[in-house]
Amino acid sequence: MLGTRRLLDGIVKTTVMVMIGFCAVGMGGVGEEKLTKIPEPDDNFSATLIDQRDVSSHITLFSLEGQTFLSGKRGGAMVSIPFGNIKEINFYARGRDIFAMVTMKKEPQVELEMEKDRVFYGQLSYGLLSIKVEYVKKTTIHSLAGQER
């Protein structure tokens, strides 16, 4: 009788552990949201964005969280640069921080320290795009819709 009780306890414990394992695996996608819409910026910039895996995407309605300017720290100051003034942005890590080397259309380059959790959005020819700043390698801003640069 005592042996049967131990056997049943072992089966119950094993079953509970297996169920917990399945639940934990099944919850792996929790927190990941589907992208069904993007913030619509005031101006429609087109851009080519290359991520850290060298995947290139041509996008329209390009924005940084709905805004058409790049904001970051320069020394102790916050700086915002309108997309219309920017030719190209190269992102790189220095330690745990993310920096952007901004090539301007008419001014010298400017380096900004970025908040890596901020998100770029855009419209692809086949869908929508969102990507955190920390996963972007390079962005080239081409034009405002209807205008060639």
Give the positions of each predicted feature.
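Intrinsic-disorder/low-complexity peptide segments enriched for small residues
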Residues: 5-6, 25, 33
